[in-house]
């Protein structure tokens, strides 16, 4: 065998062995992740088809998708002002008793700390998610008038982009 070809052949064989090992170990993981992603996208597609414009929704995923799809909150949300007019007392956690099962949402969010993206004319709004009566929890969705939808699980400590509409 040619002496110049031997190192190239050895490098080729080593590359094949490493590649086989990598793809057999990580490839399985990649396929698993791809499968999970496809299942999630399929579920989202099914949810999107099953969301009714006149429906009531409270979960993070459903409310975010509803805002994305219909550009407004579901009918079961009222602003803080509307809740106060009904007799809501935040400290006592009586929102469901005075509102018939509504959640707080639709109020402006100031973004004072500038932790969410800013743009000319952009306005931010917020709503509670996963609310089950009593005192309000820490989970919120923040959504903008130009199509951005974020989730915070910990009362504005961390933000996660859920949807981004491309405005035309």
Predicted regions and their residues:
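N-terminal Sec-pathway targeting helices
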Residues: 1-11
């Amino acid at each position: 065998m040619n002496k110049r070809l031997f190192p190239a052949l050895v490098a080729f064989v080593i590359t094949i062995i490493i590649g086989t090992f990598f793809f057999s170990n990580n490839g399985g993981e990649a396929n698993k992740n791809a499968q999970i992603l496809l299942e999630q996208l399929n579920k989202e597609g099914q949810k999107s088809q099953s969301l009714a414009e006149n429906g009531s929704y409270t979960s993070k995923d459903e409310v975010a998708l509803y805002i994305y799809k219909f550009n407004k909150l579901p009918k079961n949300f009222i602003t803080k002002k509307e809740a106060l007019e009904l007799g809501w007392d935040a400290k006592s956690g009586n929102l469901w008793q005075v509102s018939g099962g509504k959640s707080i949402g639709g109020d402006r969010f100031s973004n004072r700390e500038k932790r969410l993206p800013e743009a000319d004319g952009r306005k931010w709004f917020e709503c509670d998610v996963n609310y089950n009566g009593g005192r309000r929890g820490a989970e919120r969705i923040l959504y903008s008038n130009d199509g951005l939808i974020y989730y915070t699980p910990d009362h504005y400590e961390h933000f996660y982009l859920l949807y981004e509409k491309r405005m035309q």
